[in-house]
From Swiss-Prot:
Taxonomic lineage: Bacteria, Pseudomonadati, Pseudomonadota, Gammaproteobacteria, Thiotrichales
The species this protein was found in: Francisella tularensis subsp. holarctica (strain LVS)
SUPFAM superfamilies registered for this protein in UniProt: Ribosomal proteins L15p and L18e
Keyword RNA-binding: yes
One CC-aspect GO term: cytosolic large ribosomal subunit
Gene3D superfamilies assigned to the protein according to its UniProt record, in alphabetical order: 3.100.10.10
Keywords, sorted A to Z: Ribonucleoprotein, Ribosomal protein, RNA-binding, rRNA-binding
Name of the featured protein: Large ribosomal subunit protein uL15
One biological process term in Gene Ontology: translation
Assembly and interaction partners: Part of the 50S ribosomal subunit.
InterPro entries according to UniProt: Ribosomal_uL15, Ribosomal_uL15/eL18, Ribosomal_uL15/eL18_sf, Ribosomal_uL15_bac-type, Ribosomal_uL15_CS
This protein's record includes keyword Disulfide bond: no
GO molecular function: rRNA binding; structural constituent of ribosome
Length: 143
């Protein structure tokens, strides 16, 4: 075997369609585009979603909802993340100081995910029922 004798396997390569090259090719004259009409023209085709002038589906259906602006300032924190806070009383500012929430956050809710190993006192922070039980079980309190 030599590099100059290498060839692709038989039938693995096919010649490209040569359009408009005479009647004998089977793709002469109209080049497989039929006679006249929009699709026979160069650059002629409708845009995606066009329904022939009928009001398209994406415009017939109603719009709904919007992104809430206040959602940007609300955060949730997991129970096990409170273990990283080295303070007895956990407030919004404490969480910001320890980098658990962004500086622009205005309300926080603690959710019951993971375990809490130490007693902490939450002040001005909302929490789920499961998180409250876990905090009180660890010897902490929710104010």
């Amino acid at each position: 075997m030599k590099l100059n004798t290498l060839a692709p396997a038989a039938g693995s390569k096919s010649a490209p369609k040569r359009l408009g090259r005479g009647i004998g090719s089977g793709l002469g004259k109209t080049s497989g585009k039929g006679h006249k009409g929009q699709k026979a023209r160069s650059g002629g085709y409708h845009k995606v979603g066009f329904e022939g002038g009928q009001m398209p589906l994406q415009r017939r259906l109603p719009k709904f909802g919007f992104p809430s602006a206040s959602k940007r300032y609300v955060a949730e924190i997991r129970l096990h993340e409170l273990n990283n806070v080295v303070a007895d009383e956990v407030t919004l500012d404490t969480l910001k100081d320890f980098g658990l929430i962004r500086k622009d956050i205005k309300t926080v809710k603690v959710i019951a995910s993971g375990e809490i190993q130490k007693a902490v006192s939450l002040k001005g922070i909302a929490c789920t029922k499961g998180a409250k039980e876990a905090i009180e079980k660890a010897g902490g309190k929710v104010e």
